């Protein structure tokens, strides 16, 4: 995908324990950097990555940050505003919801700058021969027919997870893995 887009993929190395070598980060970040994509928590090693440091450094150079939250949302409370990430994504099945569902959080100001990459459905506000005007957020990115059943089921899965004492679960998990 990078090759097709003319982009350069930069990878932050890890040490023998699977932890990022943050000393190498500054050599990877510059004014050309557009987006940083990192896992909030590693699905392989379970390491809680120091994402806030990555986010702060990337933002200093004007880069956007996408956090893969597939493991983060089931292993503790997530506050995207506190993290200050631009995007946070996770799949529904990680929260005991149906496959084929997921969530993409995006900062309003970032989403408003973006153009839709698909067309159709309620995302179009008006069309003339001269231009197309898109609906306001979130409809601007809702092309086609939504997965109504999947979204309703995902909502119930999220409600279930919110009823569980996540602090107890996290403490129990830490006892099991230490």
Predicted regions, residues:
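Pyridoxal 5′-phosphate
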Residues: 1-178
């Amino acid at each position: 995908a990078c090759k097709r887009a003319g982009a350069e993929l930069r990878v932050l190395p890890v040490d023998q324990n699977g932890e990022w070598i943050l000393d190498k980060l500054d050599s990877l970040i510059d004014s050309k950097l557009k987006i940083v994509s990192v896992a909030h928590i590693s699905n392989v090693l379970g390491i809680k990555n120091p994402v806030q440091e990555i986010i702060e450094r990337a933002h200093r150079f004007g880069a956007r940050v996408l956090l893969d939250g597939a493991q983060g949302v089931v292993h503790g409370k997530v506050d995207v505003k506190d993290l200050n990430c631009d995007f946070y994504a996770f799949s529904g099945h990680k929260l005991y919801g149906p496959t084929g569902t997921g969530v993409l959080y995006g900062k309003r100001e970032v989403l408003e700058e973006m153009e839709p990459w698909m067309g159709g459905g309620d995302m179009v506000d008006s069309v003339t021969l001269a231009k197309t005007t898109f609906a306001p957020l979130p409809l601007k990115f809702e092309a086609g027919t939504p997965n109504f059943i999947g979204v309703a089921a995902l909502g119930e899965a999220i409600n279930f997870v919110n009823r569980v004492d996540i602090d107890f679960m996290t403490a129990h998990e830490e006892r099991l893995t230490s």
